[in-house]
């Protein structure tokens, strides 16, 4: 009986260490990886799990608060931040929406991935390993109502996935591939000039 308890205690300690590693990995990612780029696939699932929509594209970031999400399939859309403003360009509508970066980010997934003040904006919680990934949950300290939960998955020290549940229960999962840490990214990757004739909406 004693051996069984010792084995169980050792198992619990090992699990606790793994969970701590997930938080340490997330902290290390934010503190040490100043730039990065990857391909991504995004799957959005309805609250009842019945409907799924998929899209794909590329993601680049340069801390603090500069990032570029370029959706290419099934249709093009660009979200880019130069550190001061966030631009959303929808080519099909020929429409651009622009917001100040502080207003647009707050405690959002983009702020988590490209920001620099992790523990100021988020409360961190270790989650069990799942699907071969180490997971850490990040809960916004200021409840803004845009999403219920956010978790980040790592394979080793490499960013592998982000899963978001929004305020309506809709689940979005981004899976990253070909991640390159500390990539050399030119500053103009995070600049944006609205196309001629585009309808620009400032918020």
From Swiss-Prot:
Subunit structure: Monomer.
Protein location: Periplasm
Functional description taken from the UniProt entry: Participates in the translocation of lipoproteins from the inner membrane to the outer membrane. Only forms a complex with a lipoprotein if the residue after the N-terminal Cys is not an aspartate (The Asp acts as a targeting signal to indicate that the lipoprotein should stay in the inner membrane).
Gene: lolA
SUPFAM superfamilies in alphabetical order: Prokaryotic lipoproteins and lipoprotein localization factors (SSF89392)
InterPro entries, per the entry: LolA/LolB/LppX, OM_lipoprot_carrier_LolA-like, OM_lipoprot_carrier_LolA_Pbac
Name listed for the protein in its UniProt record: Outer-membrane lipoprotein carrier protein
PANTHER family per the UniProt record, alphabetical: OUTER-MEMBRANE LIPOPROTEIN CARRIER PROTEIN (PTHR35869:SF1)
Originating species: Methylibium petroleiphilum (strain ATCC BAA-1232 / LMG 22953 / PM1)
Assigned protein family: Belongs to the LolA family.
Entry-linked Pfam families: LolA
Coiled coil regions in record: none
Signal peptide (UniProt feature, chain positions): 1-20
GO-annotated biological processes: lipoprotein localization to outer membrane; lipoprotein transport
Listed GO CC annotations: periplasmic space
Domain of life: Bacteria
Keyword Chaperone carried by entry: yes
Entry keyword set: Chaperone, Periplasm, Protein transport, Signal, Transport
């Amino acid at each position: 009986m004693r051996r069984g308890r010792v084995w169980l205690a050792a198992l619990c300690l090992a699990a606790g260490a793994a969970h701590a590693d997930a938080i340490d990995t997330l902290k290390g990612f934010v503190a040490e990886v100043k730039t990065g780029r990857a391909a991504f696939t995004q799957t959005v699932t309805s609250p009842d799990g019945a409907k799924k929509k998929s899209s794909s594209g590329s993601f680049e970031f340069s801390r603090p608060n500069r990032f570029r999400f370029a959706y290419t399939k099934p249709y093009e859309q660009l979200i880019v931040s130069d550190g001061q403003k966030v631009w959303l360009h929808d080519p099909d509508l020929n429409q651009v929406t622009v917001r100040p970066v502080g207003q647009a980010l707050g405690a959002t997934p983009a702020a988590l991935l490209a920001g620099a003040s992790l523990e100021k904006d988020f409360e961190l919680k270790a989650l069990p390993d799942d699907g071969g990934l180490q997971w850490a949950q990040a809960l916004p300290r200021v409840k803004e109502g845009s999403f219920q939960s956010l978790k980040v998955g790592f394979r080793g020290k490499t960013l592998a996935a982000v899963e978001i549940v929004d305020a309506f229960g809709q689940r979005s999962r981004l899976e990253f591939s070909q991640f390159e840490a500390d990539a050399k990214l030119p500053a103009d990757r995070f600049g944006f000039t609205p196309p001629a004739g585009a309808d620009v909406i400032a918020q």
